[in-house]
Amino acid sequence: MTKGHLLFSSRTLRMLALGALIAFGQLCIGSAALAQERSPEQAAGQFYRWYMQSLAMSQDPLQQSPVQMSEYVTKGLISELKRRMGRKGLHADFFIQAQDFMDDWTTDIKVIRPKVQGNFASVVVGLGATPETRRWLALTMTRDGGEWKISMVRLA
């Protein structure tokens, strides 16, 4: 009886350990998903740090990095920009609203706290360190599949 009781206890302990391991795994997965969810402010800042570094390396992010662009920009905006490029080309870079950029735009990026209304957010981004070089951009962001993405950019 003692031997059977020990087997039962050992089996029960294994089941409890397995259950605890599964619960811990679910908790970790849930925490990772929450940690990956970016606010509009974080998404805008991450996008502009990556985008400006790409421009500084003479890359065309829209053409050369479609996967990364799709992480930060809505499908509709990407399609619209490609359509415009195919017709007459873009006369200025849509995301900086300029034909060229200042050196400090790649290193000095400020994101003002967004105004969020449901699945839309208004975010202001400042590029540049000085009043002479600073450019303010007004972004409209849309929650797309749980992620905040840029759907419009204009001068602020």
Please place each PLM-identified region on the residue numbering.
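Short beta-strand edge/turn micro-motifs at domain boundaries
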Residues: 134-156
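Short, low-complexity N-terminal intrinsically disordered segments enriched in polar/charged residues
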Residues: 18, 30-61
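Surface-exposed, charged secondary-structure patches
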Residues: 73-131
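Extracytoplasmic/secreted envelope proteins and their assembly/folding machinery
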Residues: 41-48, 66, 78, 138
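Bacterial N-terminal signal peptides that target proteins for export
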Residues: 2-20, 24-25
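An alpha-helix initiation/capping motif
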Residues: 63, 67, 71-72
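Extracytoplasmic/periplasmic, Sec-exported soluble proteins
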Residues: 36-40, 57, 61, 113, ...
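Structured segments of extracytoplasmic/periplasmic soluble domains
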Residues: 46, 50-58, 71-76, 80, ...
